[in-house]
Every structure is written in C-alpha cells, then in structure tokens.
Amino acid sequence: MKEVGKMYIIRKAMEYFKPKINRAYMNEVLKRLTENEKKIFLEMSDYDKFHSLEVYKKVRKTDLKNDEKYLKLALLHDCGKGNVSIVTRVLHKLGFKTELQNHAQKSFEKLEKVDEEVAILAKNHHNRGYSEEMGIFQKCDDES
C-alpha cells in the first residue's frame, strides 16, 4: 500500500467536494482545444477538470510551456476516469486495485480518433521513463 499523507488526502477531498474552477480562466484555456477535444474535456467530472487545469498551470511554468501536445495532455490526460466516487479515488491513491487502474487506456480510447499523438501520451502518462518531457509532465501531475 502507498504512503499518502493525511494533509494530501484532506486537500484532495476538499477539492473533490468543492472544486473551485475559475470559469473565465477555463474558457481562456479551452481556446487551445478543438471542438471535439472541448467536448471530451467538458464531459469530465468537475474534480478532474479542476485537477487538469491545475496541471495545465504547472506545465505552463516548465520547459513544456510552448509544447502544444503537452498543454493539451494536461487538460485531457484523465478523461478516461469517468465519474468515480471519492472512495474509489482514495483507494486507488492508496494502491488498491480499482476501476481507475485502466484510466490511461480509457483516455487513449477516447482521444485516439481526435488527436492520436495526445492519445498516445495520455496512454503513457503514468509510465515512468517514457521520455524526458513526460517526466516533466508527470511531476506537474503529481504535484496537482
């Protein structure tokens, strides 16, 4: 079982129940996406939209700030999670097997006909050692 700090779990629970999405910022960010990509993003749970916007903010502060595919990945990498409960999310974070284990593959399946390059990145966004760029992305994802 993974070691996860109490404060981390409390923060994530607060974000899950009351995600504070800045709608003006979200609308600005969505201009980067095609209509099909926007549709996928907007179908995500409020928590996953909030998380993705936080990852996007962090990616914008890295060497990937001008890399369109990684900026899109920040917004769409968790689109395969669906609307799962906080209990499932906590169990997954603690290392238990849950339906979230396959979310990267599900994200790939949702994105492959929309943007194959971003779909492949989404499929591999938890694979350590995939690429130097992915390592930068993973740090942003882990911190969000």
Tell me the role of every PLM-derived stretch:
Residues 1-39:
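Non-catalytic interface/linker regions that flank or bridge core catalytic/transmembrane domains
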